[in-house]
Curated annotation (Swiss-Prot):
GO terms for biological process: chaperone cofactor-dependent protein refolding; DNA replication; protein refolding; response to heat. The gene is dnaJ. Binds 2 Zn(2+) ions per monomer. The lineage of its organism: Bacteria, Bacillati, Mycoplasmatota, Mycoplasmoidales, Metamycoplasmataceae. It comes from Mycoplasmopsis pulmonis (strain UAB CTIP). Participates actively in the response to hyperosmotic and heat shock by preventing the aggregation of stress-denatured proteins and by disaggregating proteins, also in an autonomous, DnaK-independent fashion. Unfolded proteins bind initially to DnaJ; upon interaction with the DnaJ-bound protein, DnaK hydrolyzes its bound ATP, resulting in the formation of a stable complex. GrpE releases ADP from DnaK; ATP binding to DnaK triggers the release of the substrate protein, thus completing the reaction cycle. Zn(2+) 2 binds at C173, C176, C199, C202. It is found in: Cytoplasm. SMART domains: DnaJ. InterPro entries: DnaJ (IPR012724), DnaJ_C (IPR002939), DnaJ_domain (IPR001623), HSP40/DnaJ_pept-bd (IPR008971), HSP_DnaJ_Cys-rich_dom (IPR001305), HSP_DnaJ_Cys-rich_dom_sf (IPR036410), J_dom_sf (IPR036869). GO terms for cellular component: cytoplasm. A zinc finger (CR-type) spans 143-225. Its main location: cytoplasm. CXXCXGXG motif repeats lie at residues 156-163, 173-180, 199-206, 213-220. This is Chaperone protein DnaJ. The keyword Nucleotide-binding does not apply.
């Protein structure tokens, strides 16, 4: 008998992979190899292999046994949780243990699984919504609270969320007998098979309402506009999302509302530039201040600061102000000013005075540099 391939290798993941990573890997492979989506002759066998690996690794109990005992545990009925049969992990010829390709595939991609809200009369959360907001650069430094009118769904108070005029108006669906789904024969690669589809009479709810609530018209929920405070955290990065729970679409069958994701966009500042959690700014310095070593005022997002200029400073030199950058939970950035020397506009009188004064200065900077360059052979 051929040795089974390692389940982690089949899904292309490490042993340290978490539940989310396992599911993501399965989804990708299922999209590629599912017989309904692939024309490859090997896709059917490959999909069996993928299903087997996912069925084990997605179950914490089965995964723990597999990690400790390997494939042999599959052939031992004494290992609880594997439901092992005489052919290893069940009869793959009929897909009895895994419900065929579709049992797991449809969990991800829709279809006849009970996980789908269209096919289930169980509580199901509403759809999540998204929107966006623009804030200034300084708002992203300090954070901001925005008051905004938002729509939120709540149970209709007139019918207590039943959608019916009265309790006596709620009947079990006569078509599906309360299941929310009906079975029909469909053509497949394996011939005609039974497929569970949403009951068209009750739309998967399992109930019929003879007289709808006059307030919500049978929707069970009503939409109200409320003033909501949205907290934008200090240090927010442009494109980052803020979550508001319960401000999405209405839940199904008593399920919770969906959520609202607010994507925050930060407008550019004409002078400040963000790099990671630091703030950079080109800072002009007059050569007069440089020569006289005068103190100058530096603007920061937290207020003005003073520094004393030294004649030893170089053009493009960076001076750091600790803790004056972005402040987030795990890190505090700095403000970094890049010195840019500038010559002020002197009046004619000042220029003459400077010329007279500087002519007496022994300035050999240019000559010294030329000599250094020419001395190199």
């Amino acid at each position: 008998m051929n040795k089974k391939e390692d389940y982690y290798k089949i899904l292309g993941i490490d042993k340290s992979a978490n539940e989310k990573e396992i599911k993501k890997a399965y989804r990708k492979l299922a999209m590629e190899h599912h017989p309904d989506r692939s024309s490859s002759k090997e896709s059917e066998a490959k999909m069996r292999e993928i299903n087997e690996a996912y069925e084990v690794l997605s179950n914490p109990e089965k995964k723990a046994i597999y990690d400790k005992y390997g494939h042999e545990a599959a052939n031992n009925p004494g290992f609880n949780g594997f439901n092992a049969g005489s052919a290893g992990f069940g009869n793959f010829g009929g897909f009895s243990n895994f419900g065929g390709f579709d049992s797991i595939f449809e969990e991800f991609f829709g279809g006849s699984r009970s996980h789908s809200k269209q096919n289930s009369n169980y509580p199901y959360p509403g759809e999540s919504y998204s929107t966006q907001v623009k804030i200034s650069f300084l708002d992203s430094v300090h954070g901001r609270v925005i008051s905004q009118k938002l729509d939120k769904y709540k149970d209709c108070e007139s019918c207590n969320g039943t959608g019916a005029r009265s309790k006596s108006d709620i009947k079990t669906c006569s078509t599906c007998n309360g299941r929310g789904s009906v079975e029909k024969l469909v053509n497949s690669l394996f011939g005609k098979i039974k497929q569970s589809v949403t009951c068209s009479t009750c739309n998967g709810l399992g109930q019929e309402i003879t007289h709808k609530c006059p307030s919500c018209k049978g929707a069970k929920k009503i939409k109200e506009s409320i003033s909501q405070k949205i907290s934008i955290p200090a240090g927010v990065i442009s494109g980052q999302e803020v979550l508001l729970r319960g401000f999405g679409g209405p839940g199904f069958n008593g399920g919770p509302n969906g959520d609202l994701y607010i994507r925050v966009y930060v407008t550019e500042h004409p002078y400040y530039q963000r790099i990671n959690d630091d703030i950079y700014v080109d800072f002009p310095i007059s050569i007069v201040n440089l020569i006289l070593e005068k103190p100058v005022v530096v603007p920061t997002p937290y207020g003005d600061e003073k520094i004393k200029i030294k004649s030893t400073f170089k053009n493009d030199q960076i001076i750091t102000f600790k803790g004056k950058g972005f402040k987030r939970k795990n890190r505090v950035g700095d403000l970094k000013i890049r010195l840019k020397f500038e010559i002020p506009n002197f009046s004619s009188k000042v220029k003459k005075n400077l010329e007279s004064l500087l002519s007496e200065t022994n300035d050999s900077i240019n000559e010294d540099f030329v000599k250094k360059v020419n001395s190199i052979k």
